[in-house]
């Protein structure tokens, strides 16, 4: 048997940025496909529009900065950022929402700080928060899951809705489910019902919760979980941040549910609602804006999990992940400063 010989140093080859971004994007596709299946063509339209704007914006900035355009665009980082923005906003949001958000993410959050590897905030989440604060109506107008829609939207109707060829009166028809109730995310629905004095049990009796978690959202989270596990298998991401988030969110929500089940949703609902699995595996694990040491990553993830629970339970934004991740991004340098990896040659007890 012939063996391949190589001279020292025998170093493990790290994945290049292009390969990492491509693998993350491919692993996110099951989640995107699930969103498309349950919520229609708008998901794909928003993603494709975001990718187009991201590439054009990055090319324009690179030209102004006199940096190589083709080689930089080929690292796929702009595509991944655009994908995350596209799946995070309502599928029938006006076209200019995703355009403004994508330009903000690429030009301001990414390149204003020096480009890839220099940004202190996650670009996709910074853009999402900016859009949510600036355009709350458009960012909370979610479409009805196709299985609950009074009038499902095909591709033509979706394009008309996104690009402004549909009157607000006609568009409102597609925002109502078969029970006549305007749709929101399951977390939004629970939050609103609790503010009206309903119990969790009463809220979960609505049509949107016919599968126990929120029609469509459970399987979307399962799809992103599958993609996340694939990334762990491929060693694209480290496990500490994801485990830290899930553990902290599970523990906090379990205590809340045990203390007051009428006003606190259970841990499984927390884990499989909203953008939980998308954020846990595809957003919070961004190595540029996260802590770097093993213990630091666990603390970073735990901080996000606690913040998500607190904001979801007591704050005004039910999903909470975008705010939690940005706050954790602020804390990452502090975590790295005080929690450093052990250096080689360290003697136990010294």
Swiss-Prot record:
Q: Where are the transmembrane segments?
A: 36-56, 68-88, 89-109, 120-140, 212-232, 239-259, 265-285, 291-311, 315-335
Where the protein is mainly located, per its record?
Answer: membrane
Identify the InterPro entries for this entry. Answer: NqrB/RnfD (IPR004338), RnfD_bac (IPR011303)
Entry EC number(s): 7.-.-.-
> What is its membrane topology?
Multi-pass membrane protein
Query: Could you confirm whether the keyword Membrane appears in this record?
Result: yes
Protein name, UniProt field: Ion-translocating oxidoreductase complex subunit D
Q: Which organism was this protein described from?
A: Shewanella piezotolerans (strain WP3 / JCM 13877)
Highest classification ranks of the organism: Bacteria, Pseudomonadati, Pseudomonadota, Gammaproteobacteria, Alteromonadales
